[in-house]
Design a protein with these regions (language model features):
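Short amphipathic alpha-helices and their capping/turn segments at secondary-structure boundaries
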Residues: 50, 55-71, 192-193, 251-255, ...
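Leucine-rich solenoid repeat modules
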Residues: 12, 302-306, 310-464
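Structural motif corresponding to alpha-helix initiation and N-cap regions
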Residues: 6, 49-53, 59, 121, ...
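Leucine-rich repeat
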Residues: 31, 37-41, 63-71, 84-292, 305, 311-317, ...
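Hydrophobic regular-secondary-structure patch
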Residues: 2-87, 136-158, 184, 307, ...
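Acidic-and-aromatic substrate-binding clefts and catalytic sites of carbohydrate-active enzymes
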Residues: 44-56, 182-184, 213, 245-247, ...
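Conserved beta-strand positions
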Residues: 13, 46, 74, 139, ...
Length: 464
């Protein structure tokens, strides 16, 4: 074994498919530890409790391995029973670690019992409490969670209680999703995200299904903003915030006001949740009022779902006007629904022309939810932008228009059917293409790319 070159040993390691064998290879001898530990533990993906327990077994034997972890992926988790691979001494060490992050003996005992029962969340949280050098985290939350919230909260508030939970000082990116079960996946509240906003190195948070409830206290977000200004430690270093399939009744004010350097906000609205409220464009405008000088990317939707009725009743707000973007002087990438972009109301023309709404910094405009009967108006407004490109919109490079432009199934002739399967591929109507041709010509003349999209036409939704 001593005569085998390191390159050959590493090549053998590349062919170890079983995660348990990989983690055990680190423990063979000091040479194997030096060769495999950093490469294997630096970026780790765990998909079930069995893999996690084997991983923790290696860390119990070599505690220094926990500090090697930089990228931890727990996002593709599959719940399944696991047989414990740890002996009594190893379990005792896990109990000691659980005690170090518990605030009471009762809590420690419960955590110890949950570890023995194979509670997946208890195991995941204990691993996270040891990973003190992590840079990137991808995590799927279980439907019910207690330990994870405790670990994250105590990591940023450890001074309040004598617990040893000082991790996440180097965490830069967090991707938060949810485990699927037979019923439905869970959700997160803005309060559950707040610990990530207080981690000193955090730059990017990407979360699924965040539900921000409506409240009668409209000053809560502004109070947060005032506190952040008075106490710099309340400010977050986050520059990129992405929320998918979420429902923000207050425009995320409690989060955005904590981010003085926010450069990117990507929000996908969904009315599919039990406690959903309709999209509130004016709330977002208010919450982003203090970020006009920093925002470079603003997505106020991304093929979201909007219903005429929600749990709150008739949805009267989702087609409301967002407001002028002219003062967002750093904005380069805008994605927004047509009713929120232009204040059309009950007229056929907007109250304010599009060139007066857009900032001169704009590079890309992606306009969603354009109905066919609104397309002529939108085309005329975009033509005004093209006419002003040389003087005001020199940075404009691309325009995307997404809407309801496809040929109905009953209008498709036999030539549009697949002879083998009988399926029909939806296409954009010919008259829509003809209607958009003058705009396309204008874009070509000015060096701007134009894309027509319809979410029912798969070939048009491919990102270029």
């Amino acid at each position: 074994m001593e005569n085998i070159p390191n390159d050959v040993i590493l090549l053998i390691g590349d062919h170890l498919e079983d995660r348990g064998d990989c983690y055990n290879a680190v423990l063979v001898n000091s040479r194997f530890h030096a060769l495999f530990s950093r490469a294997l533990f630096r970026s780790t993906a765990l998909k079930n409790l069995t893999q996690l327990q084997l991983f923790m077994k290696a860390i119990v034997r070599q505690p220094s391995l926990a500090s090697v972890i930089q990228c931890l992926d727990l996002s593709r988790w599959e719940s399944a029973p696991a047989q414990s691979f740890l002996d009594a001494d190893e379990l005792a060490q896990l109990s000691i670690w659980a005690k170090s992050v518990s605030r009471s003996e009762e809590e420690h005992i419960q955590w110890e019992q949950d570890l023995l029962k194979g509670n997946e969340e208890a195991w995941i949280a204990l691993l996270l409490s040891r990973a003190n050098n992590i840079r990137q985290l991808k995590l799927a939350y279980p439907r019910e969670n207690n330990y994870l919230d405790q670990i994250f909260d105590r990591a940023v508030n450890s001074g309040r209680q004598p617990v040893q939970c000082h991790g996440f000082l180097r965490l830069e990116e967090a991707y938060l999703s949810h485990m699927e079960d037979d019923e439905s996946k869970g959700s997160l509240s803005p309060a559950q995200l707040l610990p990530f906003f207080r981690m000193p190195s955090m730059r990017k948070v990407d979360a699924d299904t965040v539900i921000e409830p409506a409240t009668s206290n409209g000053d809560s977000g502004r109070e947060t903003d005032i506190q952040a200004e008075e106490d710099p430690t309340q400010c977050s270093s986050i520059t990129d915030l992405t929320l998918n399939s979420s429902n923000a009744a207050q425009g995320l004010e409690s989060l955005t006001t904590l981010c003085p350097s926010l450069k990117s906000l990507k929000y996908q609205h969904s009315d599919d949740h039990a406690l959903a409220s309709g999209f509130q464009p004016t709330s977002f405008f208010t919450s982003l009022a203090t970020r006009k000088l920093t925002l470079e990317t603003l997505w106020l939707d991304n093929l979201g779902t909007h219903h005429a009725f929600t749990a709150s009743g008739l949805n009267e707000s989702y087609d409301g006007y967002f407001g002028s973007l002219a003062d967002f002087t750093a904005l380069k990438d805008l994605r927004i629904r047509l009713p929120n972009l232009l204040d059309v109301g009950y007229t056929f023309e907007p109250s304010t022309p599009l060139p007066e709404i857009l900032p001169s910094s704009i590079e890309r405009i992606y306009i969603e939810s354009c109905k066919e009967n609104s397309l002529p108006m939108l085309i005329s407004q975009l033509q005004l932008v093209l006419e002003a490109r040389k003087e005001r919109f020199k940075a404009l490079k691309r325009v995307d228009i997404e809407g309801f432009f496809h040929v109905d199934d009953e209008d498709l002739d036999d030539s549009g059917a697949d002879g083998a399967s009988g399926t029909r591929e939806r296409v954009i109507k010919e008259r829509v293409l003809e209607m958009a041709q003058p705009l396309r010509n204008g874009c070509e003349d000015t060096g701007v790319q134009l894309y027509l999209r319809d979410r029912a036409c798969a070939q048009t939704m491919v990102e270029v």
